[in-house]
Amino acid sequence: MKIAILTLPLHTNYGGLLQAYALQSALERMGYEVSVLDKIRKPKVQIPFSVSVKRLIMKFILRKNVAPIGQLEDYKRRKKRNTNTWKFADKYIHRHELDNLGSIKEDDYDVFVVGSDQIWRREYILNSFKCVEDAFLGFAKTWNVKRIAYAPSFGHDVWDYTPEETVSIRALLRLFDYLSVREESGVELCMRELGLTTKHVADPTMLLTAEDYKVLIKNTSKSSGNLLCYVLDMTEEADLKPELAWVKTTVLVP
């Protein structure tokens, strides 16, 4: 049986990469053939040949300063920054690269699993897919396939979909064979806004053991002794001063 995992595109988000890897691993251990749907990596724009030639002449023959083309330069920066995360994705995640979800055919997969990550956060959907309905398997609404939502997240406890989108989402989710979300607030949103009952389940990263993750780092070089503090949202509640004070008493340097 072939399973496709639909999540947000795999870029620099460590959590996104790990949840995709964990869900893939958990399903493979059950004996399934698993692929993670992912966007082809490329610049957002294609530069016309004539423009490229003109820029090369100005820069290398006429020795003129040439302003960078924003999106291309952004892609180059992202490519450099993403070196290690892309390396992880290419090595450990079975990616099915595609330009858009419309290129998938009904007989490509038997099951579609949506999740985890903030795949149901509206602003992220609009930045990643053609339309809101794609994140709810709108492209496959007439197909004879199994549909599962495992631990997707709305990203917050506010419903920001339009009334028209809400109607479409409700109809699409009613086609699912199993519905679950990552947060309790997601359970409440589904009931209040869609009239649908969902289960509250653990993030896919919790499906693996510590030993599963240790295997991934067994061949890495030893730490230099320094410490990286990664804080998603710095708030008063997330004050790290006590922890940093303790860290400074050790050999670690935050």
Where are these regions (language model features)?
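Active-site anion-handling motifs in enzyme catalytic cores
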Residues: 1-254
